[in-house]
Amino acid sequence: MKYIILFLVLIGLQANLALGSKCKCDCTKYPYSPVCAKELKTGDTETFNNVCQLQCYNCTHMKNYVVIYSGSC
């Protein structure tokens, strides 16, 4: 039983690492240019430092935020 749990944990970690590697999250070269975004499914709003960080967040959290205007929410 312990080996099954360990196996499942390792599979989860591997999937998480694979997902992270597909996402483009090197946003250091992008200037601070805040955007207000809305999540299409939930309607939640969030301020992101720039569009790169918004895209990174969407990819790593499986969300669908879209920019609704420039500036903080």
Swiss-Prot record:
Keywords for this protein: Disulfide bond, Protease inhibitor, Secreted, Serine protease inhibitor, Signal
Source organism per UniProt: Platymeris rhadamanthus
Pfam assignment, any one: Kazal_2
Residue numbers marked as site, Reactive bond: 29-30
The protein's name: Kazal peptide Pr13a
Role, per record: May act as a serine protease inhibitor, since it possess the kazal serine protease inhibitor signature.
Subcellular location: Secreted
Matching PROSITE patterns: KAZAL_2
GO molecular function: serine-type endopeptidase inhibitor activity
InterPro entries in the record: Kazal_dom, Kazal_dom_sf
Disulphide linkage map: 23-59, 27-52, 36-73
Stretches assigned to the Kazal-like domain: 21-73
GO cellular component, one term: extracellular region
Superkingdom assignment: Eukaryota
Tissue: Expressed by the venom gland (anterior main gland) (at protein level).
Taxonomic lineage: Eukaryota, Metazoa, Ecdysozoa, Arthropoda, Hexapoda
Residues annotated as signal peptide: 1-20
Primary localisation category: secreted
